[in-house]
C-alpha cells in the first residue's frame, strides 16, 4: 500500500523529491492527509497529532520522529554536495583557476574534509584551520597543511580562496584585516555563521554566504539522498 506523503520545502530538492516519490507510487498530498511529512525543519505549529515526520534541515525532528541529520551516510552525501557547490561558486566568482591556488579551509568537520579532498584533487594548495590537535596528522597525511585556529590571522594571509564551515565566528575584523584584497571568502556555516560580513564590506573584501547549496547546486541528487535516507531509516519500504 502506498504511503501518503506530504513534501514541505522551499528549494528545488523538494520538488525533485516529490517527483521521485510520485514515480514510486507515493503521490504527494497535503499535510492534513499525509501519513508522513517530509520537511526541511519542523513546521512552526508542530506536527499534527498522529502524523510521522522526517526532517532533513538544520533543526532536529521532534522526539519520536525520524531525523535525517542522524543518518551519517546522508550527512556525508550532503557534505560532498555542499563542497562541490561551494567550489563552483568560488570558480564563478574568481578570475583565477583552482589549480595551484593558495586556499584556506576553516573547520575539519564533514564539509571541511570534503572541501579539502576536492580542492586537493583540483591541484590547490590547501591550508586547514582546526581547533582539534588530533586532526592535524590526518590533515597533513592527505597533503594539506594544518594550522591552529588561534593562528587564523597568519593563515589567511595571501589566500586566494577561503571557505568557512563551522557555525562559530572565526573571521572577525581582526582576522579579516590580514586577508588579501583579491580573496574570495565564502561562508558555508549555519547561524551564528563564521564570517563577519559587515567587517568584510568595510575592508572592501569580497565575502558572502552560500546557504542550502545541495538544494540549489544539485537538487536532483539532493532529493535522491533524502529518498535513500528515508529507506535506510525504515520510513519507506524498498
Predicted regions and their residues:
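Glycine/serine-rich phosphate-binding loop and adjoining beta1-alpha1 elements at the start
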Residues: 2, 38-100, 229-230, 236
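Residues at the starts of beta-strands that form the adenosine-phosphate
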Residues: 4, 27-29, 33-35, 51, ...
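Glycine-rich adenosine-cofactor-binding loop
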Residues: 5-16, 21, 99-120
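Residues in the short beta-alpha loop(s) of Rossmann-like NAD(P)-binding domains
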Residues: 11, 131-133, 189-191
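A short, well-structured beta->alpha microelement
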Residues: 20-36, 42-45, 148
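NAD(P)-binding Rossmann-fold cofactor-contacting core
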Residues: 24-32, 122-142
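Rossmann-like adenosine-cofactor binding region
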Residues: 42-49, 139-215
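Rossmann-fold NAD(P)-binding glycine/threonine-rich loop
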Residues: 56-73, 188-235
Amino acid at each position: 500500500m502506498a504511503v501518503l506523503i506530504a513534501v514541505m520545502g522551499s528549494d528545488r530538492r523538494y520538488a525533485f523529491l516529490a517527483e521521485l516519490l510520485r514515480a514510486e507510487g507515493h503521490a504527494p498530498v497535503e499535510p492534513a492527509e499525509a501519513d508522513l511529512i517530509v520537511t526541511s525543519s519542523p513546521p512552526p505549529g508542530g506536527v499534527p497529532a498522529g502524523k510521522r515526520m522526517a526532517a532533513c534541515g538544520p533543526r532536529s525532528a521532534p522526539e519520536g520522529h525520524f531525523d535525517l541529520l542522524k543518518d551519517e551516510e546522508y550527512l556525508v552525501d550532503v557534505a560532498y554536495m555542499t563542497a562541490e557547490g561551494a567550489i563552483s561558486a568560488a570558480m564563478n566568482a574568481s578570475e583565477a583557476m583552482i589549480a595551484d591556488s593558495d586556499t584556506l579551509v576553516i573547520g575539519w568537520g564533514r564539509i571541511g574534509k570534503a572541501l579539502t579532498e576536492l580542492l586537493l584533487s583540483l591541484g590547490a594548495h590547501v591550508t586547514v584551520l582546526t581547533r582539534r590537535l588530533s586532526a592535524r596528522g590526518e590533515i597533513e597525511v592527505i597533503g594539506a597543511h594544518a594550522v591552529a585556529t588561534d593562528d587564523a590571522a597568519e593563515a589567511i594571509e595571501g589566500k586566494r580562496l577561503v571557505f568557512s564551515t563551522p557555525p562559530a565566528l572565526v573571521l572577525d575584523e581582526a582576522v579579516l584585516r590580514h586577508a588579501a584584497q583579491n580573496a574570495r571568502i565564502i561562508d558555508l556555516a549555519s547561524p551564528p555563521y563564521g564570517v563577519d560580513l559587515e567587517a568584510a564590506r568595510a575592508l572592501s573584501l569580497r565575502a558572502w554566504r552560500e546557504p542550502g547549496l545541495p538544494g540549489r547546486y544539485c537538487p536532483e541528487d539532493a532529493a535522491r539522498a533524502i529518498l535513500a535516507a528515508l529507506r535506510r531509516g525504515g520510513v519507506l519500504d524498498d
